[in-house]
């Protein structure tokens, strides 16, 4: 296959057109693609590398590490203008240095210019070009250049094959990469460790981690010795995809094969275990790592601290902070930010504030994430003045509030029924150059809907659309809910109809908002019809949806339909829960149907659900008025309901 590909593409090699350089290049780089006369008329005085007293040989020997694009162009121009012309070896040194700085397009442009000046490409030049084409995701040109190598009578070496393999893997063409290895062997080239590592990395990039493990094992069976680079991508993918048990097995296999381990490998698995919630296993591996002489670094500690904090074990996270300080490992802004956020979520604002002071005393500047965590904590406790003070501190320390900061504050104002203050802050945002996003508008629209100021909410929604801030499903849920709750069902239905015709993916929640609105407007039959049509629309019903519909039917005196839906719910495989039973029991008691209520109580008891407070209070009131006898209360008492 590869030979056919080479034959098919080799004819392109002599006439390939250099692709356009990135538009972000400088004028000097852009001139590479201009006629030679223009190229060499350029003013050259603005590069520090272009010292007129140095020859190109001096510049080549003075070191090209990290060479900048403009300097590379200047040096290339000096070389082209020199007489006699430099050898291709000199040009290759320059091209190789530029390629190491990842300026692949520039290398290809210069190679083309060199050839146009009559300097033939060597096999090394062509191999550099193949690498650059692969890195630029232009594999057809890479294989075309491979064809040119063979037409010139050269034999491609293992390095060239490995480069092409990497190019195929980068484009997720792993099956073709495996075929290329077969052809490589047929042509007498033995795969190297780089070949193996390239294939393993390619398989992992495509999510084929099990195939990567099989490949490694087969190579070991044939006497091949993988190294730590081989296993790195496999561990990464395993841990990111939640296969931490396999990652642990692989770690043990690496130990058996005497593969060099380091703190990075352990940290990868520790991170995976933390994300899987296996914190004790993560901590045990952390201790094992220390025992085996691998010193944990800031990344390892931050990973563990983050894992403990995400699981609500802030105290263990705090202990790790003290441990790392004791070991002379300096915590950074990530360490403190994770802990502060954890304390805030636990409602421990005082401790969070103390940590903020400690990090500042250590000379660690809090970032926006740190401040936002504290501001959010104050807002959630309705301590808005302290939240504003934290914003002032943030600004005084040179840390600008971002969109998240404003969204947190606006939400705090809305929750505290200070909607107008939230709107004022929203206007201030734009003056500071902070652009509102969907969350900003959603928060304000919901705030005004809940406060009954529907007209303001609608204007904000219109402003959101006019400013090209795309509403999401949450935006429409908020607006539709606000319209329905404020008696504007027809407007809600009009908007809902447009949404249904759009490409937006609708969930059960948005339909239940409309159903609730229909029931509130005494359009129970319409609500029932819409609910029954949902499966036909491909919308999956859940227990919550059934409970809402049953509750609405009971509230609107459609108890017979509620009973039908209750039985259908069970038939469809949705088990009734505590809420379902209590809704129906109260509805039947209110309809003077104690017999059905008693049957439902027995069924509820057998399912292990208790009567809720509302049901118990209703029974007590009916007992007091003589509508029920005491045996009914005795039956309820066995459901473990609290009478408090």
Curated annotation (Swiss-Prot):
Keyword Repeat recorded: yes
User: Which stretches are PPR repeats?
Assistant: 87-121, 122-156, 157-191, 192-226, 227-261, 262-296, 297-331, 332-366, 367-401, 402-436, 437-471, 472-506, 507-541, 542-576, 577-611
For this record, an example GO cellular component is: mitochondrion
Keywords from UniProt, A to Z, are: Mitochondrion, Repeat, Transit peptide
Instruction: Quote the Pfam families the UniProt record gives.
Output: PPR, PPR_1, PPR_2
Q: Where is the transit peptide?
A: 1-53
Q: Does the keyword Transit peptide apply?
A: yes
Q: What is its main location?
A: mitochondrion
List where in the cell it is found. Mitochondrion
Q: Which family does it belong to?
A: Belongs to the PPR family. P subfamily.
Record-given protein name: Pentatricopeptide repeat-containing protein At1g12775, mitochondrial
What is the native source organism of this protein?
Arabidopsis thaliana
The upper taxonomy is: Eukaryota, Viridiplantae, Streptophyta, Embryophyta, Tracheophyta
